[in-house]
Amino acid sequence: MANYTAADIKALRERTGAGMMDVKKALDEADGDAEKAIEIIRVKGLKGATKREGRSAAEGLVAATVENGVGVMIELNCETDFVAKADKFIALGDVVLRAAVASGATDVDGLLASDYEGRTLGDYVTEEGALLGEKVAVRRLARVEGAFVDAYLHKTSKDLPAQVGVLLAVDADSADAKTAAHDIAVHTAAYSPTYLTREDVPAETVENERRIADETARAEGKPEQALPKIVEGRLTGFFKEIVLVDQPFAKDPKQTVGKVASDAGTNVTGFARFRVGN
């Protein structure tokens, strides 16, 4: 006769995030001892971790916070949206984010090597992934600093945690600047710019786009004397797609993002944008 109850199974599932059959097997093996059962679940889960390493983890969440003028954002991945919306996975995202803030890490390797309750954060994430039964990985980390930093998180589904996150810094902290920063952060989430300014775009990327614009215009039979103006016009269109400050502002497309910032007495000085799986 089993030395545990249905309530014990429910409690252990809530503590570990493991499936019902895995919990029952662990309790059977542990003769009803909950702590021993947790250890069994961890061991069996970790044994399967190497098998999970090669699996794709393209679901998950983005978490972000701002403290003392420093914005920190992480992307935590798992394999399925079922785990992505689990309370235990969401709590793990908060642990990783808090560890990123506390450690001051600037990249994922440094974050995973940081200490967390007597072991590395990387080991803790692996252990939690074992309990969840999926490959769980910290994919990205961003830190953005400025006079004011806005953090914006966007849910693409009401059933899932945030899938898109933005950190956006400006060089002023007035009320107008803060409002503009938030509006531009929301814009950034929707329009996914790649670079802050034209100067940030690699020269080879610009030259390649210039060459394509020139060759395309020639193939269209445009007159030779009109080519320079046509090429520059197409380059401007290219910059409007990928450069944040050159993009038409979402709330008022007649203005650029850069103009919105300057009208608020500030400038955008940095940003980071994550979308789960991208």
From Swiss-Prot:
GO terms of molecular function: translation elongation factor activity
One matching Pfam family: EF_TS
GO CC, one annotated term: cytoplasm
Entry-linked InterPro entries: EF-Ts_dimer_sf, Transl_elong_EFTs/EF1B, Transl_elong_EFTs/EF1B_dimer, Transl_elong_Ts_CS, UBA-like_sf
SUPFAM superfamilies assigned to the protein according to its UniProt record, in alphabetical order: Elongation factor Ts (EF-Ts), dimerisation domain, UBA-like
Subcellular location: Cytoplasm
Coiled coil regions, renumbered to chain: none
Involved in Mg(2+) ion dislocation from EF-Tu as annotated region, ranges: 80-83
Annotated keywords: Cytoplasm, Elongation factor, Protein biosynthesis
Major place of residence: cytoplasm
Family: Belongs to the EF-Ts family.
Annotated function: Associates with the EF-Tu.GDP complex and induces the exchange of GDP to GTP. It remains bound to the aminoacyl-tRNA.EF-Tu.GTP complex up to the GTP hydrolysis stage on the ribosome.
Record-given protein name: Elongation factor Ts
Organism, scientific name: Micrococcus luteus (strain ATCC 4698 / DSM 20030 / JCM 1464 / CCM 169 / CCUG 5858 / IAM 1056 / NBRC 3333 / NCIMB 9278 / NCTC 2665 / VKM Ac-2230) (Micrococcus lysodeikticus)
